[in-house]
From Swiss-Prot:
It comes from Bunodosoma cangicum (Sea anemone). This is Toxin Bcg III 31.16. It comes from the Eukaryota. The lineage of its organism: Eukaryota, Metazoa, Cnidaria, Anthozoa, Hexacorallia. Coiled coil: none annotated. Disulfide bonds join 4-37, 6-30, 20-38. Transmembrane segments: none annotated. InterPro entries: BDS_K_chnl_tox, Myo_ane_neurotoxin_sf. Pfam families: Defensin_4. GO terms for cellular component: extracellular region; nematocyst.
Length: 38
């Protein structure tokens, strides 16, 4: 996946998802271009 920033935290960009993939330890997310930054 593409990296992205959620505030000052580096995350992974997921295209066209309504929630972050489960089981990967994500603690939060930000809205990002047509998807989420998790």
């Amino acid at each position: 996946g593409t990296t992205c920033y959620c505030g000052s935290t580096l995350g992974i960009y997921w295209f066209a998802v309504s929630s972050c993939p489960s089981g990967r330890g994500y603690t939060g997310h930000c809205g990002y271009f047509l998807g989420l930054c998790c």
